[in-house]
Design a protein with these regions (language model features):
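N-terminal structural module
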Residues: 1-93
Length: 93
C-alpha cells in the first residue's frame, strides 16, 4: 500500500508533524554557538544528520521564528562560521 501526500497542501505545522514522525526515535543534538559579543548559545535540534565523511558534512535544519526571522543559532553560524554539534546519549533522560 502506498500513499501520496502533497506537502504543498499542508500547513507548516502539519508538515512538521509528518516529517518528525518519519524518523523515530529522533536523535537529539545540542548545537552550541557563540555570538559576536561572546555570548554562548545552546539550542536543541532534532533536524540534523550526517551526509558524508570525506568531506565530513553535517546538515542542520535551521527553523525560523514565527515572524520569519532567523534564530540566534543561525545568526551566530552566519556571523562566525562556527558551531559544535553535541550528541545526546540515549541514557540521558
Amino acid at each position: 500500500m502506498s500513499h501520496h501526500i502533497d506537502l504543498d497542501e499542508l500547513t507548516a505545522s502539519e508538515r512538521y508533524k509528518l516529517l518528525t514522525a518519519l524518523v523515530i526515535p529522533r536523535p537529539i543534538a545540542w548545537v552550541t554557538t557563540v555570538s559576536s559579543e561572546g555570548i554562548n548559545n545552546a539550542a536543541p535540534y532534532s533536524f540534523f544528520n550526517v551526509f558524508g565523511q570525506d568531506p565530513a558534512v553535517i546538515i542542520l535544519g535551521l527553523e525560523h521564528k514565527a515572524d520569519g526571522t532567523a534564530k540566534d543559532t543561525e545568526n551566530n553560524i552566519n556571523l562566525l562560521n562556527e558551531f559544535v554539534v553535541n550528541l545526546v546519549l540515549p541514557t540521558i533522560q
